[in-house]
Amino acid sequence: MLSKNLYSNKRLLTSTNTLVRFASTRSTGVENSGAGPTSFKTMKVIDPQHSDKPNVLILGSGWGAISFLKHIDTKKYNVSIISPRSYFLFTPLLPSAPVGTVDEKSIIEPIVNFALKKKGNVTYYEAEATSINPDRNTVTIKSLSAVSQLYQPENHLGLHQAEPAEIKYDYLISAVGAEPNTFGIPGVTDYGHFLKEIPNSLEIRRTFAANLEKANLLPKGDPERRRLLSIVVVGGGPTGVEAAGELQDYVHQDLRKFLPALAEEVQIHLVEALPIVLNMFEKKLSSYAQSHLENTSIKVHLRTAVAKVEEKQLLAKTKHEDGKITEETIPYGTLIWATGNKARPVITDLFKKIPEQNSSKRGLAVNDFLQVKGSNNIFAIGDNAFAGLPPTAQVAHQEAEYLAKNFDKMAQIPNFQKNLSSRKDKIDLLFEENNFKPFKYNDLGALAYLGSERAIATIRSGKRTFYTGGGLMTFYLWRILYLSMILSARSRLKVFFDWIKLAFFKRDFFKGL
């Protein structure tokens, strides 16, 4: 694990001369301006130990952050990463994890494994960024994570769990992603499970497993038994549909073998506010997906919005084609919330500090070169950037690849950093003057697993479509393409063997509970 390696070795050297370390901290007595969420009289400022090259600070460890790290030339920059999560998560397969189709450990890759492949200086801080301070070119970190404290009680940064510090940067890459959006609906946070991180997957498994055990002790026909065996998935996008499909696979393929009576009573509900599921696909594929879900006993609620969530039931309102609105109460034992994103607090805080971002809502507004509008040296990629593109992994990956190539070119232009930092307006013209091409997104299509070894897919590049269809063969195509998308050979091999194991054995659903 990255954190354990780093804490046991302050400096971890490899034959490729990569340096992965925690930077030392010194107190400079710098007065905090109070720009962050909390004001401190003095704050420790972490100075980069290598000043021979520009310092690039990456926030996050998701698709944008790790893809940028993979492609930037670390011989030209000193690169630092801040993230409370010490690993990259392959999010497209996260819906497969709660029921044990793939192991959670198979879809994560420690940051150190990416960093050690780079030449140059790579520094990782296992901490949460709470404030970006563009006036000082620093990022405030709230504390080291609990993992850091666990592995190194006497951490050499000299920070206590709640003590802040500031890290300096020359360039900042904001790639913190987004957090789930509950749209202000009461009860979602209290009673629902999100599906965005590994802990969410474990929580869903624990809840469903506990409900199965409780329901097994109740007589058939008991209303409480029916409630415990009711699963509601809110969100008809890829995450929600794939989560519902994976749950139904577990019920039909595994639970039916050792608890057949319970399996017959499990009811999965899929709730979607739009008139159709998977609306990013063409209509015939979305219709195929809906028919398949319903044929596998998943109850699909379309044009249905959740109005309120209570401990054991939710209130939903359905708007029919004739405009009539009806209300229904859906009892549930497990509620999965898989719809909507919103900006994280560190990003909404930055909205207030840059006048050009004051009206931003969904993410940081960026120009054609992914530079945050109103800033000289802050760039944003992925879900925390707003460029009119869908919040998908392929968008973040392409943005990161593009930006890393731009940074390599920037390093070759004399005085580029100096000229960029001195610009007061029309900042993007500097990129145009030096013949930088604007970012252009290449839509490669979309994939979605439906359950029962069926999937739908649209494969394209630009305006040319190579494949569109659904069914068993598309399921195998889905698997092949997902394997190819995994960023490390290690994770790719582990996922492949998880699928091989699934063909011969049941899922490891109750492991670690």
From Swiss-Prot:
It is a peripheral membrane protein. Keywords: FAD, Flavoprotein, Membrane, Mitochondrion, Mitochondrion inner membrane, NAD, Oxidoreductase, Transit peptide, Ubiquinone. It catalyses: a quinone + NADH + H(+) = a quinol + NAD(+); a ubiquinone + NADH + H(+) = a ubiquinol + NAD(+). One of its GO terms (molecular function) is identical protein binding. InterPro entries: FAD/NAD-bd_sf, FAD/NAD-binding_dom, NDH-2, NDH2-like_C. It is found in: Mitochondrion inner membrane. GO terms for cellular component: mitochondrial inner membrane; mitochondrial matrix; mitochondrion. The keyword DNA damage does not apply. Transmembrane segments: none annotated. FAD binds at residues 55-85. Residues 1-26 form a transit peptide. NAD(+) binds at residues 229-265. Its cofactor is FAD. It holds the Pfam family Pyr_redox_2. One of its GO terms (biological process) is positive regulation of apoptotic process. Binds 1 FAD per subunit. Its main location: mitochondrion. It is an enzyme of class 1 (oxidoreductase). Its EC number is 1.6.5.9. Catalyzes the oxidation of NADH generated inside the Mitochondrion. PANTHER family: NADH DEHYDROGENASE (PTHR43706), ROTENONE-INSENSITIVE NADH-UBIQUINONE OXIDOREDUCTASE, MITOCHONDRIAL (PTHR43706:SF10). Present with 5240 molecules/cell in log phase SD medium. Belongs to the NADH dehydrogenase family. This is Rotenone-insensitive NADH-ubiquinone oxidoreductase, mitochondrial. It comes from Saccharomyces cerevisiae (strain ATCC 204508 / S288c).
